Amino acid sequence: GRDRGRPGRPLHHPARRRLLKTSDWVVLRRAVCPVLLVKQEQATPLRCVLAAVDVEADDDAHRQLNTEIIACATQLKSGASDCVLHAVSACQASDRLRQATRLATMAGVEPAYAHALVATPEDAIVDCAAWVAADLVVIGSVARHGLGAKIHGNTAERALDVLDADLLVVTLRR
């Protein structure tokens, strides 16, 4: 979680966070269903959902995860009145316009709501969530175990401490 007294600063030191198992990371790594991590202290109407996908995914697992993320985000948006769906993906500078077009098609959103950002996936998600004032970010996680999980973590885990929005993590088990 985040220390509410210091906006934008993680509660856990990043190096310590990578090496120690914290309850939220353990839940994410062992989940067999989507996990909702609530950051907001009060329930508020859902006005903006952000689907975080990898438009450049080149393997079946990540493409399937993209499909599941978009399906969850679309369902949540359709269940709320006056809610808008945005989509974000990190991309290379040379492909930005083409990837933004692909992202809009993939997510089924107007081009103005498809954000292909030249950044790391974590930074693209966090920056876009702040820019569009997302109430909820839907993100995917490919479950990892062992030393690789301990050292690298994944984008959902890295974004967890710095996002202000609630986070719905859709897990794809390998």
Model-based region annotation:
Residues 1-45, 129-174:
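Gly/Ser-rich helix-loop-strand patches that form or flank binding pockets
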Residues 11-12, 118-121:
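Short beta->alpha connector loops
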Residues 15-16, 61, 65, 117, ...:
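Residues that cap or flank secondary-structure elements
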Residues 20, 66-69, 121-122, 152:
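Amphipathic coiled-coil/heptad-repeat helices and related helical stalk/stem segments
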Residues 23, 96, 120-126, 155:
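Short acidic active-site motifs
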Residues 25, 71-74, 101, 126, ...:
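Active-site phosphate/pyrophosphate- and oxyanion-stabilizing loops and adjacent acidic/basic residues
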Residues 44-115, 168:
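Small/aliphatic-rich secondary-structure junction motif
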Residues 50-51, 127-131:
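Short, surface-exposed amphipathic charged segments that create phosphate/polyanion-binding patches used
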